[in-house]
Amino acid sequence: MLHAEARSARRGMLTLEQLRVEVGEGTIDTVVLAFTDMQGRLQGKRLSAEFFLDEVIRHHAEGCNYLLAVDVEMNTVDGYAMSSWDRGYGDFVLVPALATMRRLPWHEASALVIADLAWEDGSPVVASPRQILQAQVKRLGERGWTAMAGTELEFVVYNDSYEQAQASGWRDLTPANQYNVDYSILGTGRVEPLLRKIRLGMAGAGLYVESSKGECNLGQHEIAFRYASAVTTCDNHSVYKTGAKEIAAADGMSITFMAKPNDREGNSCHIHLSLRDRASKGVLAGDGPHGLSPLGEHFLAGQLAGLRELALFHAPNVNSYKRYVPGSFAPTAVRWGVDNRTCAMRLVGHSSSSLRVENRVPGGDVNPYLAVAAMIAAGLDGIERELPLEPAFGGNAYSDPGPRVPSTLRDALAEWEKSQLARQAFGDEVVEHYANGARVELAAFDAAVTDWELRRGFERL
C-alpha cells in the first residue's frame, strides 16, 4: 500500500530552492510561519517572503510565550509555570521545520511553514503539542519503530457566515443539508461546490486527498486524507482544519468542528494508528487471534488501560464530553472490538499491512498531536508491561456495564492529575500545564450563565 510519504515530491510541497525561485519570480510573496497551540489552532505570523529567506531561515522568529498559556478567548490566565505576568510574558522562538513548507492555494501568493518552539537557549518548549508528539515518536524510534497515523475529521457546514452566526448568538443557523446525508450522493451534491474547493485546496497544499462523504447530522460531512507518519498527519490535520474554515468563510459560509454543536450527532475525529519496523513491516500484525502479534495485543491492551487516564488529551473541552451518547456512534464503553463501531477501540484492516487500531474517542475539537501522543504512550505502556488483552467485545458495547469513557471534563482532569502513566510518559511539566488548561476551561464554564438556566429559571424560579 502506497502511503503519502512514499511520494517525495507531492504537489503543493515546496523545497527551499523552489521557494527562492518563486519569490524571485514574484509568484510567492508571503510566508505564514505557524505552530499549533494548546487548543489545536494555528498561531503565528505572516512574513514577507523576502524577509523569511534573508533572516528567518537563519535566525528564526519570535512570538510571545503566552500563546501556550491562554484560554480559547486568548485571555491571559493564571497558573502556568512557563508563562505569566510574574515572568514578564517573554518570547519563545519559532524554528521553521522546512520539510513542512507548502503552498496555500486559497491565499494568493502564499506559502506556509510549520514551526517548532524553542527557548532562547535552544532547548525545546516541552508543553508545545508538536514537541509532545515528537518526544513519543522518539521513544518509538529507540525501538526501531515508526508510527503511521490517519485522522478522520468531521464538520458541520452552515449557509450562514461566521459573522452572521455570531450576530445570531450561534442559534437558528441554516445547515447546508436539511436531512441525514450519510453516504448520500444526492445530498452531498448540494454542498459539493464547497467540498470540492476544500479538496482541491488541500491537494494543492500537499495533502493526499482520498474522498469526501456525507454524515448523519444536518450539514455534516467528512473529508478523508491518506495516512502518513504521525507528525506529518498531525501537521496536515492542522493545515486542513484552518484551511477549511478559511475556504468556507470566503464563500460566505461557516464550518464548525466542535464536538457537539447541537442535540444531534457530534463531530468525531477517529484516529487510526499502526506501527512499522525498519523494514516497513507492521509491528501489530501477527498470527494471533484477529491477526494481532503479541506486541499488537499488548499495544491494544495499553490503549484500554490508559484511556481514562489520558482522556484529557482525547477530549480537551467541556463540550467534548457531550458527544458520548449511547447509540450515537460515539463510544461510551472502554472496550475494543473487531470492526465494532460501538467500542472505544476498533480493530480494522484486512491484511497484515493494513491492520490498525481506530480510536473512536476523540471529537472534532481534538488537538491531534496530543491525542496521537497519548495513543503512543498508552501503547508503549502496554508493551513494556506486557499487558494481557481482554477478549474482543461482540455486540452492543453501549449496554456494557464495564469501565466507561469519562463523562465530564472534571472527571477526566481528576484521572489525569493522578495518572502515573501521564507523568512517566510526558513529564510533570506537561501534566501540570495541561491540567491547568482544563481547570481554566472548567472555571469559565462554571461561571457562565447558560440558555438552559435562563429557560428554566427566568420566570419560574
Cite the ranges covered by each PLM segment.
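Catalytic-core signal marking the mid-to-C-terminal active-site face
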Residues: 2-6, 14, 26, 246-247, ...
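Acidic, His- and aromatic-enriched active-site or binding-groove loops in soluble protein domains
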Residues: 170-197, 230-241, 245, 279-285, ...
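Histidine-centered divalent-metal-coordination microenvironment in nucleic-acid enzymes
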Residues: 154-168, 214, 218-226, 258-279
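ATP/Mg2+-dependent ligation/transfer catalytic cores
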Residues: 1-211, 253, 401-461
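Conserved structured core elements
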Residues: 13, 130, 149, 192, ...
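Gly/Pro-rich turn-and-neighbor structural signature
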Residues: 226, 233-239, 245-246, 252-261
